[in-house]
């Protein structure tokens, strides 16, 4: 008996959101998407009962814009468990260790979805338990423990239960959006978190609490409320790198422009309908063919490595210096320092006095980050294309099923597959590597609102793709015959 037969009784009974039986009207899809978005913002503002927020430490602070969620809320873990489970499944599927045919076998599809949910539950435990009980990153409030009479261990149990419920909720919220809404829940949550930071970075006012945003700062500079240094060197540093944030604004606008341009670069393969004369179309193979979602997997892998390092530092007294050295919870040396991604200008601009790190160490760290992101982006893009039905074989079958064919070629899926193999694998690798390079460069230069460059890159690309999906949904809504022809529902 194989593992599928042994695991089927458990995996097939995993709770799941029911698929719609027929076509879901566009307005209803928008309603589901908007409702889940409101619920997400609500849950990020529900604080953990029993948490001593004053001494709590956000393990995913540097990666929060990518992993979504909110520190100290029931969505403490964000999409981390979902993404980590996806990494494991991508690696197992890429090595063909699962033996699942998710394209053609309904039974394997059910097993795959059940296995994903099981892995998400495991990742919630593997991430949440050390965070609460071992590393003391989410300490219990002593006053709550005394008033309830259950001790700090009991309060920590309550904290873990809350973040576990939050992890399960975000899993099913993602599934609802994927089946009943527009786009994916993971992408929606990233857009929500990054947009919130971006708007705050542009429009926040010091009088409302916190630091001044970009516009408030420049109003102060223009009116003279904020004094600028007299020295030309200090003036340029303040305007571009300091309060003025001009470099951050330029980087933000540059990322918007590059991503929108890259999304529009494509190779278009002509198609014609086999039975309807004059019906023609094109199959676009975009430069960023695999989308930017594989980049979430790469950054999440880095986040898990750093999470493990901080956990070891807090619980392993004799942790060797070659593995990692920490100062005030931040890695400053050892292997984990070199593996830590560049997050902002303060991590590498030694020539401006923004960091005291050795220039050679900084150069090695930047080089490792570039290699990790470029190679990782390409590898995960390949895995993503193959496991999401975007590879040459799956695409050829979809074109065949829609009644389309490539002019000048026989109407045969094998023939279409050979044509697709000329473009899809190469474009997938180039696009994945390009996104990795852009992510590192964006992080190095910084962005408005202290949003990570990777987070902004993901947000712009996901928003662009969401716009395309909404336009496609509206077209299908106006012309139901096209929906039947291309099998959208």
From Swiss-Prot:
Its main location: membrane. Residues 60-67, 68-79, 80-88 dip into the membrane without crossing it. The keyword tRNA processing does not apply. Residues 48-59, 136-153, 204-244, 314-364, 447-450 are extracellular. It is found in: Cell membrane. Residues 1-20, 89-110, 179-184, 267-291, 385-427, 466-488 are cytoplasmic. InterPro entries: SecY, SecY/SEC61-alpha, SecY_CS, SecY_dom_sf, Translocon_Sec61/SecY_plug_dom. SUPFAM superfamilies: Preprotein translocase SecY subunit. It is a multi-pass membrane protein. The chain crosses the membrane at residues 21-47, 60-88, 111-135, 154-178, 185-203, 245-266, 292-313, 365-384, 428-446, 451-465. GO terms for biological process: intracellular protein transmembrane transport; protein targeting. It comes from the Archaea. Pfam families: Plug_translocon, SecY. Keywords: Cell membrane, Membrane, Protein transport, Translocation, Transmembrane, Transmembrane helix, Transport. One of its GO terms (cellular component) is plasma membrane. Belongs to the SecY/SEC61-alpha family. Component of the Sec protein translocase complex. Heterotrimer consisting of alpha (SecY), beta (SecG) and gamma (SecE) subunits. The heterotrimers can form oligomers, although 1 heterotrimer is thought to be able to translocate proteins. Interacts with the ribosome. May interact with SecDF, and other proteins may be involved. This is Protein translocase subunit SecY. It comes from Haloferax volcanii (strain ATCC 29605 / DSM 3757 / JCM 8879 / NBRC 14742 / NCIMB 2012 / VKM B-1768 / DS2).
């Amino acid at each position: 008996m194989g593992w599928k037969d042994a695991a089927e009784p458990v995996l097939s009974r995993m709770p799941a959101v029911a698929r719609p039986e027929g076509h879901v009207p566009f307005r209803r899809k928008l309603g589901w998407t908007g409702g889940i978005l409101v619920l997400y913002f609500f849950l990020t503002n529900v604080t953990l009962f029993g948490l001593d927020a004053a001494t709590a430490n956000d393990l995913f602070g540097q990666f929060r814009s990518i992993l979504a969620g909110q520190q100290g809320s029931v969505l403490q873990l964000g999409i981390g468990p979902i993404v980590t489970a996806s990494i494991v499944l991508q690696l197992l599927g890429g090595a063909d260790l699962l033996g699942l045919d998710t394209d053609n076998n309904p039974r394997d599809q059910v097993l795959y979805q059940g296995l994903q949910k099981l892995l998400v539950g495991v990742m919630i435990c593997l991430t949440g338990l050390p965070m609460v009980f071992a590393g003391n990153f989410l300490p219990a409030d002593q006053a709550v423990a005394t008033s309830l009479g259950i001790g700090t261990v009991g309060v920590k149990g309550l904290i873990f239960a809350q973040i576990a419920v939050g992890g399960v909720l975000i899993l099913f919220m993602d599934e609802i959006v994927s089946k009943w809404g527009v786009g994916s829940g993971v992408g929606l949550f990233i857009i929500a978190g990054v947009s919130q930071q971006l708007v705050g970075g542009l429009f926040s006012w010091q009088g409302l609490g916190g630091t001044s945003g970009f516009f408030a700062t420049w109003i102060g500079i223009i009116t003279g409320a904020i004094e600028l240094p007299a020295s030309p060197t200090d003036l340029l540093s303040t305007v571009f790198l300091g309060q003025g944030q001009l470099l951050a604004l330029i980087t933000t606008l540059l990322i918007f422009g590059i991503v929108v341009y890259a999304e529009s670069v494509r190779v278009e393969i002509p198609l014609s309908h086999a039975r309807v004369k004059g019906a023609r179309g094109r199959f676009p193979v975009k430069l960023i063919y695999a989308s930017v979602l594989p980049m979430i997997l790469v950054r999440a892998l880095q986040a898990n490595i750093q999470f493990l390092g901080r956990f070891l530092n807090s619980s392993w007294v004799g942790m060797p210096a070659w593995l990692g050295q920490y100062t005030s919870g931040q890695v400053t040396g050892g292997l984990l320092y070199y593996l830590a991604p560049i997050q902002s200008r303060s991590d590498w601009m030694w020539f401006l006095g923004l960091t005291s790190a050795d220039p050679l160490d900084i150069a090695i760290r930047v080089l490792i980050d570039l290699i990790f992101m470029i190679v990782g982006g390409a590898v995960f893009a390949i895995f993503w294309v193959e496991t999401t039905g975007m590879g040459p074989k799956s695409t050829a079958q979809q074109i065949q099923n829609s009644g389309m064919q490539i002019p000048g070629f026989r109407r045969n899926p094998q023939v279409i597959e050979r044509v697709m193999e000329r473009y899809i694998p190469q474009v997938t690798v180039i696009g994945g590597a390009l996104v990795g390079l852009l992510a590192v460069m964006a992080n190095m230069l910084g962005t408005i609102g202290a949003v990570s460059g990777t987070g902004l890159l993901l947000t712009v690309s996901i928003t662009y793709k969401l716009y395309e999906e909404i336009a496609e949904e509206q077209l299908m809504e106006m012309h139901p015959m096209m929906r039947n022809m291309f099998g959208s529902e």
